[in-house]
Amino acid sequence: MRIAVFADKFSGTLTSDEVIGEIKKIFKYNNIKSSFFPVTDGGENSTEIFKEYGFETQQMSMKQDFSGKWLPVETLKVNKNIYIETSQLIGIKNTNDLSLDLNTSCLAKIIEDVDILSMGGSRTNDAGIGLLSKMGIDFLNNKDVIEDPKPKDFKLINNIKINESFKKVNKKVLIDTNIPLLGDNNAFKVFGPQKGLANSEIKFLEKNVERILNLLSNEMDSSLDPFKEGTGASGGLSFALGEVLGLSLIHI
């Protein structure tokens, strides 16, 4: 008998290849015949795993991440689609900066160039508000636009304006969790601590994000659902992509 072993990463500890390496040692010692296959949920390090299965690099280019650093960012050809792993630009390993000082606005520069975006492995907790601020939605304090809003600025937001440049986006998003953005078991409570959030900061985000999304829902004259499964991926980025921008969320 031969055993097939499929291994994903153990976030924050081992890559899928490292997991396979440890299992191989045990199987070899016990003379167990096996075949090994790295797998991915579309999150962090998914680019490397896709390449192991023959998907080719579409482009390697220098992009600015959420901390301001210029990094080589890789997109892949996946069947007839262009794929990007968003953690390359907003990943938890990119910086030690506080997540309240970070947002997703850097993704606005790549979203038009790809067909599929993957979630997971982020340090962000901005519910995609940073990205939305670059996609035609202004977040204001009274009549003053808050440029590039970050979570630390959320308490200042008391008005929202939808500009003519705002439009829906016909693309796909791979999400690696069923956790909602808001609710009892929300993204801030579940993933916030591993991104350095204190309990007081989690409560701050819950309160202000819900308030801001109510403003946004009223301004769009649309029912936005931050309690829907899967809207909490990458600090709520999947909410902004799916509920506001209209991308299709695919659970994997």
Name the predicted role of every residue range:
Residues 22-26, 53, 128-141, 190:
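A glycine- and small-aliphatic-rich helix-loop capping segment at beta-alpha/alpha-beta transitions
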Residues 78, 82-118:
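Hydrophobic alpha-helical hairpins/lids featuring a short glycine-rich hinge
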Residues 25-94, 171-181, 188, 238:
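Glycine-rich nucleotide/cofactor/substrate-binding loop typically near the N-terminus or early
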Residues 1-4:
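Extreme N-terminal starter segment of soluble prokaryotic enzymes
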Residues 250-252:
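Conserved small/polar residues in nucleotide/adenosyl-binding loops
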Residues 86, 144-145, 149-152, 171-236:
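Carboxylate- and glycine-rich phosphate/diphosphate-binding segment that chelates Mg2+/Mn2+
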Residues 6-22:
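N-terminal beta1-alpha1 ligand-phosphate binding loop
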Residues 102-112, 116-119, 123-170:
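Glycine/threonine-rich beta-strand-loop-alpha-helix active-site module
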